[in-house]
C-alpha cells in the first residue's frame, strides 16, 4: 500500500489549516486501519523557523513515517488542456500518483491539465479548481480529491459546489487553481486559457 500524504502550507512561521489536515489524516487512518489513537499534527511539526513559503510534507500510514520541510515555489500556469479519464480514482491523498502523472505527461504544449471524469470537471494535476461567472465562484461537486483548502473555502462560503460539465465551461469567465500550498486567488486564469 502507498503512503498517505498531508501537505501543509507554512509561511511567516505559521502553519495553515491544521485542524482540516488533522481531520483528513485521522479519518484516512480510521478508514484504512480501524479505530486507533488519533494523531495531532500540531504537536509533531514546528513551523516557527520557516519565514518563506515552505511545504511541510507528512508521509504516514498507521503512524507518521516522515516529516519534511521543503522550500516551495508556485509553478506558473497560464494554460490548461482538458484530458478525459473515466476510471481515475484519487479519493485519498497518497504517494501513488501514477494515473495523474500519465495524464499530466499528455498535456502537450499546455502548462497543466484539467481532468474530466464522466463528462464532469474535477481537478488539475495538483489543484482543486473553481469557476467564476463574474459574481460567484463554483467548485466541481465531484473533485478527484477533496482538498483541505477546498473544504476551508466551502465552509467560509467563498466557493459553492456545483455540477460542472465540459459544456458548462463556456458559461464562466475565470478559473482559479488552489490547493494547500496555493492560496485562493493566487492563480486566476481567463476561461479562454482552457483548451476545450
Regions of interest found by a model, annotated:
Residues 122-128:
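Short beta-strand/strand-turn micro-motif
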Amino acid at each position: 500500500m502507498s503512503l498517505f500524504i498531508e501537505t501543509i502550507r507554512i509561511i511567516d512561521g505559521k502553519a495553515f489549516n491544521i485542524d482540516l489536515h488533522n481531520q483528513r489524516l485521522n479519518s484516512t487512518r480510521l478508514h484504512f486501519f480501524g479505530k486507533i489513537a488519533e494523531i495531532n499534527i500540531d504537536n509533531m511539526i514546528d513551523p516557527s523557523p520557516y519565514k518563506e513559503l515552505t511545504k511541510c510534507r507528512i508521509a504516514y500510514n498507521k503512524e507518521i513515517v516522515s516529516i519534511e520541510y521543503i522550500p516551495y515555489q508556485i509553478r506558473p500556469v497560464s494554460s490548461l488542456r482538458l484530458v478525459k479519464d473515466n476510471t481515475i480514482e484519487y479519493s485519498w491523498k497518497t504517494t501513488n500518483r501514477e494515473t495523474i502523472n500519465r495524464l499530466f505527461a499528455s498535456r502537450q504544449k499546455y502548462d497543466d491539465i484539467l481532468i474530466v471524469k464522466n463528462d464532469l470537471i474535477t481537478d488539475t494535476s495538483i489543484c482543486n479548481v473553481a469557476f467564476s461567472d463574474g459574481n460567484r465562484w463554483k467548485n466541481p461537486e465531484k473533485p478527484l480529491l477533496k482538498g483541505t483548502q477546498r473544504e476551508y473555502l466551502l465552509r467560509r462560503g467563498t466557493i459553492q459546489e456545483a455540477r460542472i460539465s465540459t459544456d458548462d465551461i463556456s458559461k464562466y469567465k475565470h478559473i482559479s487553481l488552489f490547493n494547500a500550498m496555493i492560496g485562493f486567488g493566487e492563480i486566476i486564469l481567463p476561461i479562454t486559457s482552457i483548451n476545450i
